[in-house]
Amino acid sequence: MDKKSARLRRATRARKKISELAAHRLVINRTPRHIYAQLIAPCGSQVLAAASTVEADLRTTVKSTGNAEAAVAVGKAIAERAIEKGIKTVAFDRSGFKYHGRVKALADAAREAGLQF
């Protein structure tokens, strides 16, 4: 089993457990260059809010888009957008990535901005 298939297996297992909770899901995806966050409805088929380093307003505020500083900016942005929609409690879906580095920075920033998970 290679590294990617192991990560996808972990992600599938976590998503199965989160779907049983019937809670809003904060989904993270990261690439070497960017980080993305989406808020998904409990039904699983509707994206309620999104933030990423691809967006022009976030790209102008950070020096580089592939580091922890950029992840903090995305975490704050997704939390603000979720609270605008009236969502304060979410389930954190790290997509099989380690809770370390950019993923942890995004999660901590979202918590500081008011999201609970």
UniProtKB/Swiss-Prot annotation:
Pfam families this protein is in? Answer: Ribosomal_L18p
- The superkingdom of the source organism is Bacteria
Keyword field contains Cell division:
no
| Keywords, comma-separated and alphabetical | Ribonucleoprotein, Ribosomal protein, RNA-binding, rRNA-binding
Q: What InterPro entries does the database record attribute to this sequence?
A: Ribosomal_uL18_bac-type (IPR004389), Ribosomal_uL18_bac/euk (IPR005484)
Any one GO molecular function term = 5S rRNA binding
Q: CDD domains from the xrefs?
A: Ribosomal_L18_L5e
What cellular component GO annotations does this protein have?
A: cytosolic large ribosomal subunit
What Gene3D superfamilies does the annotation carry?
3.30.420.100
The UniProt entry, under PANTHER family, shows: 39S RIBOSOMAL PROTEIN L18, MITOCHONDRIAL, LARGE RIBOSOMAL SUBUNIT PROTEIN UL18M
Question: What task does this protein carry out?
Answer: This is one of the proteins that bind and probably mediate the attachment of the 5S RNA into the large ribosomal subunit, where it forms part of the central protuberance.
Family per record: Belongs to the universal ribosomal protein uL18 family.
Q: How does it assemble?
A: Part of the 50S ribosomal subunit; part of the 5S rRNA/L5/L18/L25 subcomplex. Contacts the 5S and 23S rRNAs.
| Protein name listed in UniProt | Large ribosomal subunit protein uL18
Q: Which organism is it from?
A: Pseudoalteromonas atlantica (strain T6c / ATCC BAA-1087)
Recite the lineage of the species.
Answer: Bacteria, Pseudomonadati, Pseudomonadota, Gammaproteobacteria, Alteromonadales
